[in-house]
């Protein structure tokens, strides 16, 4: 799938990141096992998935996601699954990858400032069906949410097809 925002093009792949393609970001579709809802980070009306940049001390993609999810949203992540990657083509730069994972939220801690910038994000919990529209990422987000739903159903048996009503966990 190809999606374009201005001159940037995004290609979604449900395969491992090829050797030599730099991973600049690891974001997660983090699901509550009780409600079947996914966490969408709310920064004063700008929405994103939890995650961030891999650091050299992170052992792997899972370590990046677990660290970033707690720093930004104060959620403890249990089991995770790799979903795929978004290949990004930006003029004047070599293509790079943005990894996407799914994960199970084990606990919500009290909200606190993100150590990188001091922001306190709200935690919107919504359905996988609604999340792509909230994020505003177009068709790649729809495909990613679909991949997350398949994993959530098959591997974790989460109630993603009948989630509870959306709301904030603050």
Question: What feature does the model see in each segment?
Answer:
Residues 30-33, 103-105:
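Active-site beta-strand termini and strand-to-loop segments that position acidic
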